[in-house]
Amino acid sequence: MAESFGVKMGVEGEKEFKNALKEINSAFKVLGSEMNLVTSQFDKNDKSIQSLSARNGVLTKEIEAQKNKVQTLQAALENASSSFGEADSRTRSWQIQLNNAQADLNKMESELKANEDAIDRLGQEMEEAEEQTDDFAESLSDS
């Protein structure tokens, strides 16, 4: 009897996790459309601070949603593992989804880091250009 209760709880818990993942995936569709909007507002090769900052804003939201997805998948995996056992196909399916979600999170975080580095480089280049302009203006006034 206790075993059937555990399986019942596992199945019901699995339904809840699937519903939670549907909500998260729906949020990703909205974020994907937001990224498409940002991309359409700037040339694809636009590396301006404004363009990179806009992408960072959306990437940050995507990363938060992805972290939520990873947490949900971790909980689903734990639930399936305790309810069905680690060798069960449902447990393995959750493990695969978790691995893929974690890999996607790693990619998103790398992209965000690359954008932040590009913003920093652009900021430094702007400062250097400003200093050179000031130096040039100063040399003209000295002449």
Where are these regions (language model features)?
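Residues at a specific register/face of alpha-helical coiled-coils
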Residues: M1-E16, A20-S143
